[in-house]
From Swiss-Prot:
Residue ranges, annotated region (Disordered): 174-193
First and last residue of the signal peptide: none
PROSITE patterns reported for this sequence: RUVC
Gene Ontology BP term (one): DNA recombination
Binding site for Mg(2+) 2: E68
Location in the cell: Cytoplasm
Binding site residues for Mg(2+) 1: D7, D141
Family membership noted in the UniProt record: Belongs to the RuvC family.
Assembly and binders: Homodimer which binds Holliday junction (HJ) DNA. The HJ becomes 2-fold symmetrical on binding to RuvC with unstacked arms; it has a different conformation from HJ DNA in complex with RuvA. In the full resolvosome a probable DNA-RuvA(4)-RuvB(12)-RuvC(2) complex forms which resolves the HJ.
Protein name as it appears in the record: Crossover junction endodeoxyribonuclease RuvC
Major subcellular location class: cytoplasm
Keywords: Cytoplasm, DNA damage, DNA recombination, DNA repair, DNA-binding, Endonuclease, Hydrolase, Magnesium, Metal-binding, Nuclease
GO cellular component: cytoplasm; Holliday junction resolvase complex
């Protein structure tokens, strides 16, 4: 399974491509950053991001596009641009019939390090280790895109399906799956389900 990870951003949109094989074997394929000029109008910047993402999807033909879920930040303009870039990734994938998965930064950290509050350098080191890279992926947007792709490939309902899935989870993945199930049950209780 080929997973294309996207760390959305209006100025720098990270793109990471990995292959998920049997027994949680992940292989690095590609990493890049699609850039737009902050001095251009927002519509032209979004078009550059969209065109760049379309080109990557056409080149690597992923089975899934995994996008970092956008959360509200203090800077409203930043979150707006980030959300719009995420929308461009979703649109490009939908036009190609590619399934989209959204993952939070906490999910990504939990899947990769076993710690939902891991520091950026811990994430970068684990991404390099998981993908057997000789150096840390740079810039940060590129590393984050690879992390989102890895998160999707390693999640319990990602690349591994059925009985094989449970059998090959790492301790960190088991902990993450249990935490996700617990959080889902708690939300259901609060909503009166």
């Amino acid at each position: 399974m080929i997973v294309l990870g996207v760390d959305p951003g209006l100025t720098r949109c990270g793109v990471g491509v990995i292959e998920a094989g049997a027994y949680r074997r992940l292989s690095f394929i590609h990493v890049d950053v699609v850039r737009s000029d902050p001095h251009e109008s927002q519509d032209l910047r979004l078009l550059k991001i969209y065109d760049g993402l379309c080109a990557k999807m056409d080149e690597f033909i992923p089975d899934t596009v995994s996008i970092e879920r956008v959360f509200a930040q203090e800077n409203r303009n930043t979150v707006l641009g980030t959300a719009q870039a995420a929308g461009m990734a979703m649109l490009a994938a939908a036009q190609r019939g590619i399934p989209v998965a959204l993952h939070t930064p906490t999910e990504s950290k939990m899947a990769i390090t076993g710690n939902g509050k891991a520091e950026k350098i811990q994430m970068e080191r684990m991404v390099a280790r998981i993908l057997n890279l000789n150096a840390l992926p740079t810039p940060a947007d590129a590393a984050d895109a690879l992390a989102i792709a890895i998160c999707h490939a390693l999640r319990p309902s990602g690349a591994l399906e059925g009985g094989e899935r449970e059998q090959h989870l790492t301790p960190a993945q088991r902990q993450w799956a249990q935490a996700t199930q617990h959080a889902t049950r708690r939300r259901g209780v609060r909503r009166g389900m």
